[in-house]
């Protein structure tokens, strides 16, 4: 049985101007849709006060968005292969707007149903993972750069939406802000999905031209599903520390006496730095491979999150937030590059969303765990410390996979030159 060790010789590229048009349209859609989990982050304390409950209860709503998005990506990825990305993404936009409307009604259960089921499972679940798979099918040589571009939608959203949400919540309240954002989702995403998205190249044609790994091959000398399981476990571990500052930075700053506007600005700085460095990480993944790029990014994230334990002044936290953004931004796209390098294109519709489900479950668990630890201890240091622990666990798993890949490549090279 063949083994996937080194990348095969690539035939003429499938990439074209249409490939980058598809990537730019996806970037625009994700720049809007990625705002949905940020509204609860920015409005964590006002929503908590309005509903009269614990912080972990509200943080769970944000966590449910990630779990729903991950699980929905598997279901909607399967559906997108059958009815087309245009229709699944349009369904996602409508469900996201409906979820925001339900969440704004002012009860904890409405918040959970709106965020977990409608915004997460049926909303972002129909948009994020299916669009990522859609874009990977337009590229074979610069897939890492393309994924870096579209994933920057998260950081464009992070630059724009926190300040908009903070001002909207201050002036009009969190419920009105949710409804206004729902209107923006419908007004922008629906026309883009219905009128502009075009079918990707046929999977079999892309497979033949790009030298995809063959179905049934072992991966890194192991069963293919075992390798995917290890990648998913690593993703779960690395997304736990990723979620702590992403989900609690504004509330963390408020607890330290830093103005909410400055906390929202700090989150924007974090995501702006992530946006600026994202293309570097994409080029690195194209050059050294997805797994090695993941390991470098995860090591940078571990160093940066440790900084949140070492400083509590505003200037220092701005610097640490910037460093964290620069470090973590390339990790998730590099995982996708690794999966597309190691597995056939025909399996991308379920392998990539499965990875996203575990990664987003890690984001959900990390966001909820940070809120729970805060409720128990009354401050955020334990949450950041636990984040460092899981980051080290991630590095152990990824280090094992990189070692297997290096060993496998050496064996293939020795066989080829014998």
Language model regions located:
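Extracytoplasmic gate region of multi-pass secondary transporters
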Residues: 40-44, 225-279
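Cytoplasmic helix-loop-helix junction between adjacent transmembrane helices
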Residues: 115-152
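Helix-loop-helix hairpin linking two adjacent transmembrane segments in secondary transporters
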Residues: 141, 149-201
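Extracytoplasmic
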Residues: 21-55, 73-76, 161-162, 245-250
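C-terminal transmembrane helical hairpin of 12-TM major facilitator-type secondary transporters
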Residues: 262, 268-338, 355
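Interfacial helix-cap and linker-helix signal at transmembrane-aqueous boundaries
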Residues: 47-48, 79-80, 160-172, 253-254, ...
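Conserved MFS/SLC helix-loop-helix module at the cytosolic interface between two early adjacent transmembrane helices
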Residues: 71-109, 285-288
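Hydrophobic core of transmembrane alpha-helices in multi-pass small-molecule transporters
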Residues: 31, 99, 110-126, 236, ...
